[in-house]
Amino acid sequence: AATTLRRGGGREPTPPATPPTHARPDPTRRHPDPESRAPPHARPRSPPPPAPSPPPLPPRPAAVRAGRDRVGRVFSRLPPGCAAGSCYPATGDLLVGRAPRLSASSTCGLRRPQPYCIVSHLQEEKKCFICDSRRPYDARSNTDSHRIENVLTTFAPRPKKAWWQAENGVEHVSIQLDLEAEFHFTHLIMTFKTFRPA
């Protein structure tokens, strides 16, 4: 043990040195978070709160849904390229295959043979002819038939020999064609056998 000198020549014993104490961690004491000691600019930023979701849309009315469904079905049936812009379908002869749907208010020779005269043949030897439309036109056996179906374009030999003709003296004659559907009508070609009617 260390001693200290006193004034009388005697020595005063020094108290024994206490051994150093080691601090033990206190489990009940909360230690500061190391991130809390970091400077403000070094602390990680917490993610922003999520944005509130928009309110749900009201259900579409049944009529609107049905209308849009019908439009979608129509566009799905269109040929390619029609839904993006104007559509020009292929043109064709609307009379082909529709002979039963074609009718005329007057046709010569349906009940009995009837005579008729062609004005353009006045200077020729034969000016008047017989119309017998009781049977359909045939290039070999019945060339005097002039039913309304003769106006159809066919690939029969000598097609210009067949035509439709109304009765003599009948006015306000009309031709009717039932197409059974809607079409985009572009043009009509009519070829007259004689002079055009006034």
UniProtKB/Swiss-Prot annotation:
It is found in: Secreted, Extracellular space, Extracellular matrix, Basement membrane. Residues 23-38 have a biased composition (Basic and acidic residues). Residues 1-64 are annotated as: Disordered. The keyword Disulfide bond applies. GO terms for biological process: cell adhesion. Disulfide bonds: none annotated. SMART domains: LamNT (SM00136). Laminin is a complex glycoprotein, consisting of three different polypeptide chains (alpha, beta, gamma), which are bound to each other by disulfide bonds into a cross-shaped molecule comprising one long and three short arms with globules at each end. Binding to cells via a high affinity receptor, laminin is thought to mediate the attachment, migration and organization of cells into tissues during embryonic development by interacting with other extracellular matrix components. This is Laminin subunit beta-1 variant.
